[in-house]
Amino acid sequence: MAQTEVDARSIFAQRLKAAREDAGLTQKELGTSVGLPQETAAVRINRYEKGVHDADLATARRIAQSLGVPLAFLYADTDVLAEAILTLGLLSKSEQRKAVADLKARLAQAGGAVEKD
C-alpha cells in the first residue's frame, strides 16, 4: 500500500472521529443514519475511525451529510484547510463564491506570493 493511501486513510479516520464526537453521535447512531445495518453499524464506523478500512466514496458522502460537514473536510490534509472548508461550508453558495473571490483578490494583491508554514 502506498504511503499516500495510508496518510489519506489516517486523515479520514481522525477527522471522522472528531466530527462524530462533535456531533454527539455514537458509532452505531452514525452508522445506522447512513444506512449501514444496525447489527454492524458500530463495527464499520469503528473500523473507519481506526483506519482499518476505507469508506467508499458513496459511504463517505453519506457520512459527511449525516455529520453536517462537507465531504472535503474529511479528507483535508491540514487543520487550517479543514477549518477553511468547514467555514466555507457554512456559507450560502453566493457567499462562498464571494469569499473565494476575496481570497483570490488578496492573493493577487500579494503578487501571487504565498507563505507556507
Q: What do these predicted regions represent?
A:
Residues 14, 24-25, 40, 55-58:
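Residue-level signal for the short linker/turn that defines the boundary of a DNA-recognition helix
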